[in-house]
Amino acid sequence: LIRRPLFSFLTPTRIFDQSFGEHLSESELFPTSGALSPFLLRSPFLRTPSWL
């Protein structure tokens, strides 16, 4: 029997339905990471300042 958390609508249900032998891909865990990563890598806020 699979028990779900009280606020299951806030979290992906795929994680709770997963069996232990099954692999979860990064795209299933973070579906927007592929779309955001080019912007995050080019973001000036994440670069080391030139005065350091």
From Swiss-Prot:
InterPro entries: Alpha-crystallin_N. Keywords: Eye lens protein. The keyword Transport does not apply. Homodimer. Aggregates with homologous proteins, including alpha-A-crystallin and the small heat shock protein HSPB1, to form large heteromeric complexes. It comes from the Eukaryota. One of its GO terms (molecular function) is structural constituent of eye lens. This is Alpha-crystallin B chain. Belongs to the small heat shock protein (HSP20) family. The keyword Cell membrane does not apply. May contribute to the transparency and refractive index of the lens. It holds the Pfam family Crystallin.
